[in-house]
């Protein structure tokens, strides 16, 4: 007579199913975590499901630090804390812990402990498994969560293609640019020179009404004359202050105009592209990937007097004589001798009782 085959499973990852188990996820996790094993437990995930007839059952994934040889069919039995009842599981070695984890997560009623140990194997295998991983990553809705999914489900790509994944997910999950809302009513600026008003009327327009080659403008004046807040109150724009960042996180190709504020002209990259409202040019600023700029919009250059800020003084340098001749054909130059406002004004709303000083914003 053949002896019955003895029970033995030797695996790092165990998949347990408890049919007709009334324990909560918390009770099951606590009991499993307290089991004494020769090799340390690294991760436990418990999923509670209901059959169509309403009977509950539990699925569990347990990951060990090394292979754990189980010879006792009752080792993973759970006990009811309120009545004399034992719950015996079906015990299997999990060939792919990633597949088991995905299976447990399909209904969402789960509880976990520890840190999941990434497993490169998948019982599904092939291209379909890779497509599933990337589809799941895209459905997360954020870059950080997408990277976590790929780290778990596509570890080879995560290690070998991390740079590309990081860059591509930056583009895919780029948040919409925050729309700037001017804190001042247009009526606050009651001393705007006529030549500035005319420049705005002719050049700051949407794409349909904008001139094919709009003219840019350089506005030079002392601090606290309202240059910045006035320039930013004219419509949708890109605001570049101190240095250039043309990444999609900051720069919009749908803006009506650019504002370049307090950038030393000696170090202004793409001087002609901005001032000449050039179209379809590429930026390869340091430490960033090339960015395609739609262009065709005017730029307001804001500066203070002085050799390290004034565009006029920069263009008056002998070495820049050719650039100056070009600039005079592509931009207007205005010097402010007084503020663009006459005093104190109501703030963003007419009902505001607090007096607001535009110069405090510039």
From Swiss-Prot:
Active-site residues, record numbering mapped to chain: 103 (for dna cleavage activity)
Domain notes: There are 3 rolling circle replication (RCR) motifs. RCR-2 is probably involved in metal coordination. RCR-3 is required for phosphodiester bond cleavage for initiation of RCR.
Motif (RCR-2): 57-59
Domain CRESS-DNA virus Rep endonuclease as annotated: residue spans: 8-116
Protein name, as recorded: Replication-associated protein
Positions contributing to a divalent metal cation binding: 49, 57, 59, 107
One function term, GO molecular function aspect: helicase activity
PROSITE patterns according to UniProt: CRESS_DNA_REP
Keyword Lyase: no
Taxonomic lineage: Viruses, Monodnaviria, Shotokuvirae, Cressdnaviricota, Repensiviricetes
Comp. bias regions, Acidic residues: 352-362
Coiled-coil ranges per UniProt: none
Recorded GO CC terms: host cell nucleus
Functional summary from the UniProt entry: Essential for the replication of viral ssDNA. The closed circular ssDNA genome is first converted to a superhelical dsDNA. Rep binds a specific region at the genome origin of replication. It introduces an endonucleolytic nick within the conserved sequence 5'-TAATATTAC-3' in the intergenic region of the genome present in all geminiviruses, thereby initiating the rolling circle replication (RCR). Following cleavage, binds covalently to the 5'-phosphate of DNA as a tyrosyl ester. The cleavage gives rise to a free 3'-OH that serves as a primer for the cellular DNA polymerase.
């Amino acid at each position: 007579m053949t002896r019955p085959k003895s029970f033995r499973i030797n695996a790092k990852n165990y998949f347990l199913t408890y049919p007709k188990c009334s324990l909560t996820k918390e009770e099951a996790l606590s009991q499993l975590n307290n089991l004494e094993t020769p090799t340390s437990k690294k991760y436990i995930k418990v999923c509670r499901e209901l059959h169509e007839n309403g009977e509950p059952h539990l699925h569990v994934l347990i990951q060990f630090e090394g292979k754990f040889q189980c010879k006792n069919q009752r080792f993973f039995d759970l006990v009811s804390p309120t009545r004399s009842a034992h719950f015996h599981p079906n015990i299997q070695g999990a060939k792919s812990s990633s597949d088991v984890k995905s299976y447990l997560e399909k209904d969402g009623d789960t509880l976990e402990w520890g840190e999941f140990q990434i497993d490169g194997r998948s019982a599904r295998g092939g291209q379909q498994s890779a497509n599933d991983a990337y589809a799941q990553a895209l459905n997360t809705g954020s870059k950080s969560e997408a990277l976590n999914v790929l780290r778990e489900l596509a570890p080879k790509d995560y290690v070998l293609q991390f740079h590309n994944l990081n860059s591509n997910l930056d583009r895919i999950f780029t948040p919409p640019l925050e729309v700037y809302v001017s804190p001042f009513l247009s009526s606050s600026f009651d001393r705007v020179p006529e030549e500035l008003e005319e420049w705005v009327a002719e050049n700051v327009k949407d794409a349909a009404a904008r001139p094919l080659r709009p003219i840019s403008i350089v506005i030079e004046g002392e601090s606290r004359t309202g240059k910045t807040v006035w320039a930013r109150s004219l419509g949708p724009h890109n605001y570049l202050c101190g240095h250039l960042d043309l990444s999609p996180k900051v720069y919009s190709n749908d803006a009506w105009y650019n504002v370049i504020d307090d950038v030393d002209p000696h170090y202004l990259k793409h001087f002609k592209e901005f001032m000449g409202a050039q179209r379809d040019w590429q930026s390869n600023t340091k430490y960033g990937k090339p960015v395609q700029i739609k262009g065709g919009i005017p730029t307001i250059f804001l500066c203070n007097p002085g050799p390290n800020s004034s565009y006029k003084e920069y263009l008056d340098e002998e070495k820049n004589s050719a650039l100056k001749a070009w600039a005079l054909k592509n931009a207007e130059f205005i010097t402010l001798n007084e503020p663009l406002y006459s005093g104190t004004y109501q703030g963003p709303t007419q009902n505001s009782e607090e007096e607001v000083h535009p110069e405090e914003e510039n």
